[in-house]
UniProtKB/Swiss-Prot annotation:
Modified residues (Glycine amide): 31
Note: Teleost species possess three paralogous GnRHs: mdGnRH and cGnRH-II have been identified in tetrapods; sGnRH has no tetrapod ortholog and is thought to be a duplication of cGnRH-II.
Chief location category: secreted
Keywords of this entry: Amidation, Cleavage on pair of basic residues, Hormone, Pyrrolidone carboxylic acid, Secreted, Signal
Protein name, per record: Progonadoliberin-2
PANTHER family, A to Z: GONADOLIBERIN, PROGONADOLIBERIN
Location in or out of the cell: Secreted
InterPro entries with a match to the protein in the record: GnRH (IPR002012), Gonadoliberin (IPR019792)
Transmembrane residue ranges: none
GO molecular function, one term: gonadotropin hormone-releasing hormone activity
Signal peptide from the UniProt entry: 1-21
């Protein structure tokens, strides 16, 4: 039983790390509102301009594999 609880805890932690939650450090305000004076283009929109939209990609078989590949792609994009 304790292994199940540990596994669920690890899965919850990994899921929270891989989710696309809003972060205070990125200049967002509570409630998902942006500052009205700045007109920033989001990173997702920049990717769409180059034809790399995540919603335009064909669906992959494994949901977990999809999450891991998207996380790796974001990390590589940050390093560029």
């Amino acid at each position: 039983m304790s292994r199940l609880v540990l596994l669920l805890g690890v899965l919850l932690y990994v899921g929270a790390q891989l989710s696309q939650a809003q972060h205070w450090s990125h200049g967002w305000y509570p409630g998902g509102k942006r500052e009205l004076d700045s007109f920033e283009v989001s990173e997702e929109m920049k990717l769409c301009e180059t034809g790399e939209c995540s919603y335009m990609r064909p669906q992959r078989r494994s949901f977990l594999r999809n999450i891991v590949l998207d996380a790796l792609a974001r990390e590589l994009q940050k390093r560029k």
